Amino acid sequence: MKCLNDGELKNMQKKYDWLLFDADETLFDYPSHIGLARLAARYGIAWTDEDYARFQAVNQPLWRAYQEGRIDIGQLEAQRFADLTARTGQPAPQLNRELQLEMAQLCNLLPGARELLVAAHGAGIRIGIITNGFAVQQEPRLRASDVSQYVDLLVVSELEGFPKPDRRLFEAALRKMKQPAPQRVLMIGDNPDTDIAGGARAGMDTAWYNPKGRACPEHVAPTYHIRHLQQLHAVVLPPR
C-alpha cells in the first residue's frame, strides 16, 4: 500500500471529533538504550551494546506475548528485568519504575507532533492517547514535553486490563470519550498490528504513520498511510 501524497490526502478530508494517538514512536521517540544505560549506571553497571542487545532479545518477544494476551503486564515486567534484578539485587517493579521515570524525561516529541496537536486543538478537535506503555511514565512525559494541555484523554492498557490490539481497550476509550460514533474518531499509530488493526476492529478510521516505508501486512488496511505527521493536517483540519 503506497503512502498518500498531500493532494490525495486533501481529497480524502473528513471531519473528526477525536484524534486518538499511539504514544511511543508515533508522538514520542523512545531512546530505551539511553534510559537503560542510565538505570544501570545507578547501580554501578557499565551498560554495553551487548547488554542492550541481550535485553531486547528478551524484551521484544515479551511485548509480543503481552499484546497477544499470552502474558500479563506483571509477567512482562518481571521477566524482562530478570537479568538486571540478578545483577543489582533490586526487584523488577522498582527497576521498571525507575526506568519509566527516566524515560519520561528522555522522550522527545517526533517531528510534526507538536504542530499537529496544537493545530487540532485549535480547530476544536479533541485529542486522546492510547498506549500499551506503563502508566507511571505517561503523565510525567506529557508534562516534560509541555503538551499535557492539548491532551483530553489518556488510556493506558495497564490500567484497563486489555492491551492493544484488543478491541475492548478501544471500546474503553470510546466510553471515556462519551461514546462518539467510532467513524468520527481517527486512530493514528506506527504499529499496524496493534494500532491500526485494533482501531479498525472498533470501527474507527485509522492512519498508519510509517516513516520508514515498511511494507503493510496484508491483513491490515489503514484508511490513510502517511510518512510524516504533518500530512494529517490536510485530512483533519478544516480548509482555510
Residue ranges: model-predicted function:
Residues 2-19, 46, 50, 118-121, ...:
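Asp-based, Mg2+/Mn2+-dependent phosphohydrolase catalytic module
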Residues 9-57, 87:
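Active-site neighborhood of HAD-like aspartate-dependent phosphohydrolases
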Residues 29, 129-131, 208:
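Hydrophobic residues in well-ordered beta-strands that form the structural core
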Residues 61-98:
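A metal-dependent, Asp-based hydrolase signature
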Residues 33-41, 74, 78-82, 135:
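An amphipathic alpha-helix signature
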Residues 44-54, 85-98, 150, 181-182:
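Short, surface-exposed acidic
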Residues 74-75, 93, 97-129:
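Short, acidic loop-to-helix structural element flanking the phosphoryl-transfer center
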